[in-house]
Amino acid sequence: MPMHGAQRKLLGSLNSTPTATSNLGLAANHTGAPCLEVSIPDGLFLSLGLVSLVENVLVVAAIAKNRNLHSSMYCFICCLALSDLLVSGSNMLETAVILLLEAGALATRTSAMQQLHNTIDVLTCSSMLCSLCFLGAIAVDRYISIFYALRYHSIMTLPRAQRAIAAIWVASXLSSTLFITYYDHAAVLLCLVVFFLAMLVLMAVLYVHMLARACQHAHGIIRLHKRQTPAHQGFGLRGAATLTILLGIFFLCWGPFFLHLTLVVFCPQHLTCSCIFKNFKVFLTLIICNTIIDPLIYAFRSQELRRTLKEVLLCSW
C-alpha cells in the first residue's frame, strides 16, 4: 500500500508534493516510460516494526535492570534503543490507523484525524532525529574512550551524559515541531539533509581516526614481539571491513530517505524523481531495518548486556 501525501504532513510531503503527484500520472501517460515501484506489503512492514519494537524494548529493559550498565556509554545505547523503538512504533501506529480507516473500521472527525497525524508526525520526526543524534553521540563517546582513555571517566561523567541526552531529546522535539509546522518550505528539508550529512561525516571521521589509531597500536605490538607483517595487514583489513559495514549500513538505510528529501526540493516535477517518490515506503522500511540492526551492532556485542538479557527473558517466562 503506497502512502499518499494527504495522509502525512512532513513525511507525507516527502512522499509526494501536490505538484509532483498531480503531474505524475500525466507524465507517465505521455512518455509511456515505466516506473520501478517496489511494493512493500503492509504485513511485512508491520512485522519488521514489531521485531524492532521487541528488540529495542529488550535492550532498554536489560540496561535498566543491570546497574553495572548505568554508565554514560550504555546510557547513549539505551537512548538509541528508545529512539529506534519510537521510530518503529510511530510508523507502525500510523500504518495501522491508515489500514483501519481504509477498512472503515475507524470513523472519526477530520479535525481529530489531522491532530492525530500531526502528533504522529512530530513523534516520528523527533525520534528519527534522536536516533541520528545518538548514533553520533556513541561515536563521540567511543572516540573519547580511545584517545583520552586516562581522562575518559572524568570527561564522560554520568551527569554530563545525562545533560547531553536531555539536550538531544529537547532539541529534537522542538526541531520536529518546527519542521512539521513549516514542512512546505524547502529550507526545512535542506536542514534535515544537511543534518544527516553532518552526522555521516562526523561518524566517518571519528571511526576512521579510531581505526588508524587501532592499526598503529597493533603495528607497535607486532614490532615489539617481532611478528610478521601479514598479521598487521590482516588486522587492518578486518578493521576496515568492520568500519565499512558500520558506515555502509548507516548510509544504505538512511541515505535513500534523505536522497528523497533532496529530490523533493530540487526536482519535484521531474519524471525520474517522480518515480523515486513512489518508493517512499521502501525508504521508511530501510530505516525500520536500521532500527533492527542497531542493537546487533551497538548493544548485543556486550557480554554483560547479553547476560542480563538472558535474565530478563528468563524472568519474563
Swiss-Prot record:
GO terms for biological process: adenylate cyclase-activating G protein-coupled receptor signaling pathway. Keywords: Cell membrane, G-protein coupled receptor, Glycoprotein, Lipoprotein, Membrane, Palmitate, Receptor, Transducer, Transmembrane, Transmembrane helix. Residues 64-72, 141-163, 212-240, 301-317 are cytoplasmic. The keyword Transmembrane helix applies. It is found in: Cell membrane. The keyword Chaperone does not apply. Glycans are attached at residue 29. Receptor for MSH (alpha, beta and gamma) and ACTH. The activity of this receptor is mediated by G proteins which activate adenylate cyclase. Mediates melanogenesis, the production of eumelanin (black/brown) and phaeomelanin (red/yellow), via regulation of cAMP signaling in melanocytes. This is Melanocyte-stimulating hormone receptor. It comes from Saguinus midas (Golden-handed tamarin).
